[in-house]
């Protein structure tokens, strides 16, 4: 089969490479530089498995900027374009997804389109009715940035928002490329699948917020956070995972998904969902106040990225801390080797790590790094377990 991937971010590339082990895959992107890299078997994003598979595996994979070449004769088109959250409308910006749907409908109306981008609850049903089309399925992704292909090779589950033969064929494409066997697979309706994605990510955000509030409590009262978390997590119903305190949840998915779900609750009584969003804001206030209490002249931000093994710092929690500190008039310098710019939000980027360490009175790091251990007395982090 010919499978086209529209969008070459984490979601698109990981799905494309997974399927290209067994089928023809054409990746479509509007950025020529990314297409050129992919055709040279180089990854435009930081992801260990994507880089490895592109360089060493026998993949039936190519990239193009030509939508006619990409969509023509495709059996499936996977839509993995960005859907950023718009705070003005309280809604995902689905314009890129809609543009792909219109293009595919014009060029190859027989292709089955599968939306992998995160979308509002009810979007698939609504656009099918609005455009008078039926060949559209939603299938949520559950991957981590920096480990996107790994998570597709070893998926926790596969969810397809349709119960049909074509949905089963698409699930088989994902199962065929995976290393994991006997993957739990759920076939449901499109609107339920959309809700599954948002509620799953909101639960993860809630868990992050819970352990962060536990940590704020312990730090305020001089208690040992690690001992409390270890004791709480001995209960198998809670489990000893996803429990490492941080500066708040961040990244591309959790902040926008929680806010979108909250917007979907406008006509439904709720307390918990809104509390999760508020708790994340409160945590950043708490962290910023703790840093400012040290009365630093210069605060060093060690890495803007959200987690190790990633090159993405969209909506990373440390940016919220940085903005709060700058608002109090404290000078901020940044060490972020993946950035080519000289400044970020009017704060200087220091390229030399030794100079960065020397100039900062306090260094804040969401996760502790080996290269900071020689200045551990300067470092402020809430990382207890060395995990994301």
UniProtKB/Swiss-Prot annotation:
Catalysed conversion reaction: UDP-alpha-D-glucose + 2 NAD(+) + H2O = UDP-alpha-D-glucuronate + 2 NADH + 3 H(+)
InterPro entries: 6-PGluconate_DH-like_C_sf (IPR008927), 6PGD_dom2 (IPR013328), NAD(P)-bd_dom_sf (IPR036291), UDP-Glc/GDP-Man (IPR017476), UDP-Glc/GDP-Man_DH_C (IPR014027), UDP-Glc/GDP-Man_DH_C_sf (IPR036220), UDP-Glc/GDP-Man_DH_dimer (IPR014026), UDP-Glc/GDP-Man_DH_N (IPR001732)
Protein's pathway: Nucleotide-sugar biosynthesis; UDP-alpha-D-glucuronate biosynthesis; UDP-alpha-D-glucuronate from UDP-alpha-D-glucose: step 1/1; Bacterial outer membrane biogenesis; lipopolysaccharide biosynthesis
GO biological process: lipopolysaccharide biosynthetic process; UDP-glucuronate biosynthetic process
Keyword hit for Phosphoprotein: yes
EC numbers: 1.1.1.22
Keywords: NAD, Oxidoreductase, Phosphoprotein
Post-translational modification: Phosphorylated on a tyrosine residue. It results in a significant increase of the dehydrogenase activity.
Residues the entry annotates as binding NAD(+): 2-19, 29, 34, 83, 118, 145, 252, 256, 314
Positions annotated to bind substrate: 141-145, 197, 201, 242-246, 250, 307
Keyword Cytoplasm on entry: no
Superkingdom as given in the UniProt entry: Bacteria
Active site: 253
GO-annotated molecular function: NAD binding; UDP-glucose 6-dehydrogenase activity
Family: Belongs to the UDP-glucose/GDP-mannose dehydrogenase family.
PANTHER family, per the entry: UDP-GLUCOSE 6-DEHYDROGENASE (PTHR43750:SF2), UDP-GLUCOSE 6-DEHYDROGENASE TUAD (PTHR43750)
Annotated protein name in UniProt: UDP-glucose 6-dehydrogenase
Organism (species): Escherichia coli
Lineage start: Bacteria, Pseudomonadati, Pseudomonadota, Gammaproteobacteria, Enterobacterales
The gene coding this protein: ugd
């Amino acid at each position: 089969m010919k499978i086209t991937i529209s969008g070459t971010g984490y979601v698109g590339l990981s799905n494309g490479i997974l399927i290209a082990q067994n089928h023809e895959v054409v990746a479509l992107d509007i950025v020529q530089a990314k297409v050129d890299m992919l055709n040279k078997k180089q990854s435009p994003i930081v992801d260990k498995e994507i880089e490895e598979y592109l360089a060493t595996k026998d993949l039936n994979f190519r990239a193009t900027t030509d939508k006619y070449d990409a969509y023509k004769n495709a059996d499936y088109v996977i839509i993995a374009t960005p859907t950023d959250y718009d705070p003005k409308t309280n809604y995902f910006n689905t314009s890129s997804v809609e543009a792909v749907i219109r293009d595919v409908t014009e060029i190859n109306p027989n292709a089955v389109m599968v939306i992998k981008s995160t979308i509002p609850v009810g979007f698939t049903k609504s656009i099918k009715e609005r455009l008078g089309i039926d060949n559209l399925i939603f299938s949520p992704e559950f991957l981590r940035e920096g480990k996107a292909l790994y998570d597709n090779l070893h998926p926790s589950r596969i969810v397809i928002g349709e119960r049909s033969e074509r949905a089963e064929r698409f699930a088989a494409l994902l199962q065929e490329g995976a290393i994991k066997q006997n993957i739990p697979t759920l076939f449901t309706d499109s609107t339920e699948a959309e809700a599954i994605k948002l509620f799953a990510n909101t639960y993860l955000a809630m868990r992050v917020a819970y352990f962060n509030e536990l940590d704020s409590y312990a730090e305020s009262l001089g208690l040992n956070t690690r001992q409390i978390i270890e004791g709480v997590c001995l209960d198998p119903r809670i489990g000893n995972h996803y429990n490492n305190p941080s500066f708040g949840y961040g990244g591309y998915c959790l902040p926008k998904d929680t806010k979108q779900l909250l917007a979907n609750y406008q006509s439904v009584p709720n307390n918990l969902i809104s509390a999760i969003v508020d708790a994340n804001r409160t945590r950043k206030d708490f962290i910023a106040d703790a840093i400012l209490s040290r009365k630093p002249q210069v605060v060093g931000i060690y890495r803007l990225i959200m987690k190790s093994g990633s090159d993405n710092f969209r909506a990373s929690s440390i940016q919220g801390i940085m903005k709060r500190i700058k608002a109090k008039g404290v000078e901020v310098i940044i060490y972020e080797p993946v950035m080519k710019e000289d400044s970020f939000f009017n704060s200087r980027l220091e390229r030399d790590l030794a100079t960065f360490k020397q100039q900062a009175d306090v260094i804040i790091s969401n996760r502790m790094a080996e290269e900071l251990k020689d200045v551990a007395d300067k470092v402020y982090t809430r990382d207890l377990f060395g995990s994301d």
